[in-house]
Amino acid sequence: MPGEPVTPPLFDDKGKSVMARITPDDVGRYVILSVHDPLGYEQDVAEVIAGYMDEARLIADTHMFVTYTGTYHGVPITVCSTGSGAPETEIAMVEFFRFSNADTFIRAGTSGTYLEDIDVGDLVIAAGAVRDEGTSAAYVVPTYPAIANHEVMLAMAEAAHALQIPYHVGITRSTDSCQAGQGRPVLDYLQEDSARIPEYWKKVGIKNFERETSIIYVLCSLFGFRGGAVNAVVNSTPKGNLEVGAGSDSVFRTVLEGIRILAEWDAIKERTGVDFLLPSMIAKRP
């Protein structure tokens, strides 16, 4: 009828996702999302992370997304590599929302920093994210916060601490632009506002900057899932250095160990019949 809303068809191929080619039987409860990132890894990052698992099998390679499912200390985990930025991450997440029973999504990636006290190779566990990307605005107003699930964030911090890996917890800035939008001149050109980006975000204490965390946090909060992010710092503005691959091993070990810890906590919640993890439930008794 004239005037009725018209929507495009959903990406669905007889019960299987079109972009990632996954089904519910293929996917574990915990999903690691990572980017095909030349600043971190020479081979596909899903294959790299799968190599850290006890066992893993290739679910699908669609050129856009590569997906493996395996176990780590008995915990079923799926890892999916995506293209860079919020739009590509959105596509992957919506496919997992619709075609799996996963409820926990954790970014394992790379980032930069404007702060002197964070070194290249350190990890940043994002408690929240600045939404300086456009994709999340398609879902909800700009004042809606992008925040981590507290259980995921604590599990990642617990893992990094146990592994004795240098880490920081704080706010990440997610951008669309990897160049001018992060304060990098292009052929000696930079708008005045862009030139002030490093100093401004340094002043307000943003720990790091990248391109994906905010969309993960917004989508997870909006649709009732758990989101987290652990990013290695591979470039430092104040120190003027970039180190390809810095901290990648630390990120992968932290995220996998963090998921193992989170699975233990989830089991405690299930046994006690509570919805949210409380400190008293995991406190070590003397």
Provide a role label for each language-model segment.
Residues 1-90:
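N-terminal short beta-loop-beta anion/metal-coordinating cradle
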